A protein has these predicted regions:
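Active-site acidic carboxylates
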Residues: 2-119, 123
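Alpha-helical scaffold elements lining the catalytic groove of polysaccharide deacetylases
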Residues: 127-139
Length: 139
């Protein structure tokens, strides 16, 4: 596939309402002492595929902001993933086949959105592949 491919535009669509979501099938309960919040792929490059201030991205960003604030207040650690720009083709793996070159080091691509920026006690995991945890700096 071409190495010049980028992310396609994602058309607007409404988020499902609570009553449209399927019921939880697993009886899991949140254990605050074992919980963490993962804010995944909120860099300008990825979010730029959506139309700003329109659904789904506008309510998603507001929800992430609220979740992160509540997690911090509850003492739950907040982790972010951030992909490095200008990754070597061999490091991109399947991502290169599907999406081409990927993000660059530019300020238009690299930073996590200002409204969701990590706070001093948050953690940023460098993301190399689709999995946020492969070759991560998480110990």
């Amino acid at each position: 596939m071409s190495s010049t491919k980028g992310l396609p535009r994602i058309p607007t669509y409404p988020l499902p309402r609570a009553e449209e979501l399927p019921a939880a099938r697993a009886p899991w309960r949140l254990e605050r002492d074992r919980a963490a919040l993962l804010v995944h792929d909120m860099q300008r490059y990825f979010v730029g595929a959506f139309t700003p201030d329109e659904p789904p991205i506008e309510p998603v960003l507001a929800n992430i902001h609220a979740l992160a604030a509540k997690a911090r207040l509850a003492g739950i650690p907040v982790f972010y993933t951030a992909q490095e720009g200008d990754q070597d083709r061999r490091d991109r793996g399947l991502q290169a086949d599907l999406w081409g070159k990927g993000m660059g080091w530019s300020q238009d691509h690299q930073p996590i959105l200002d409204d969701l920026a990590p706070q001093p006690r948050d953690f940023v995991l460098v993301k190399h592949r689709y999995s946020a945890f492969q070759r991560s700096n998480l110990e």
